[in-house]
Amino acid sequence: MPGRKARRNAPVNPTRAELPPEFAAQLRKIGDKVYCTWSAPDITVVLAQMPGKSQKSRMRSPSPTRVPADLKDECAQLRRIGDKVNLRQKLLNLISKLFNLVT
């Protein structure tokens, strides 16, 4: 907007406390494990090693799979829809060929 000025960045605090070396080493070790392996069981083990952190949520089980009969019904329904769309497209192509005889 024309009447507004951009905000300045926050000033850098030179007295900011640095992490003690043992905490930095532990964070580095945890980060290496997380980024190298990246699978759910390993992550839960790594998170369990972090002091003072509790696990917020458990891993959910995957959604239940469909019954094969439902899949067959859905497949048949999709085929019927595809057949109708295919028939409509063929009719449109035929009509466009009949009315657009300019070659």
From Swiss-Prot:
Induction: Up-regulated after exposure to ionizing radiation and other genotoxic agents. Up-regulation is mediated by p53. Signal peptide: none annotated. It is found in: Mitochondrion. Detected in thymocytes after irradiation with X-rays. Not detectable in untreated thymocytes (at protein level). Detected in embryonic neural precursor cells of the telencephalon Constitutively expressed at low levels in adult brain, testis, thymus, spleen, lung and kidney. GO terms for cellular component: Bcl-2 family protein complex; mitochondrion. Keywords: Apoptosis, Mitochondrion, Repeat. Residues 90-99 are annotated as: Required for mitochondrial location. GO terms for biological process: apoptotic process; DNA damage response; fibroblast apoptotic process; intrinsic apoptotic signaling pathway by p53 class mediator; intrinsic apoptotic signaling pathway in response to DNA damage; intrinsic apoptotic signaling pathway in response to DNA damage by p53 class mediator; intrinsic apoptotic signaling pathway in response to endoplasmic reticulum stress; negative regulation of fibroblast proliferation. A motif (BH3 2) lies at residues 78-86. A motif (BH3 1) lies at residues 27-35. Interacts with MCL1. Interacts with BCL2A1. Interacts with BAX. Interacts with BCL2L10. Belongs to the PMAIP1 family. Promotes activation of caspases and apoptosis. Promotes mitochondrial membrane changes and efflux of apoptogenic proteins from the mitochondria. Contributes to p53/TP53-dependent apoptosis after radiation exposure. Promotes proteasomal degradation of MCL1. Competes with BIM/BCL2L11 for binding to MCL1 and can displace BIM/BCL2L11 from its binding site on MCL1. Competes with BAK1 for binding to MCL1 and can displace BAK1 from its binding site on MCL1. The BH3 motif is essential for pro-apoptotic activity. This is Phorbol-12-myristate-13-acetate-induced protein 1.
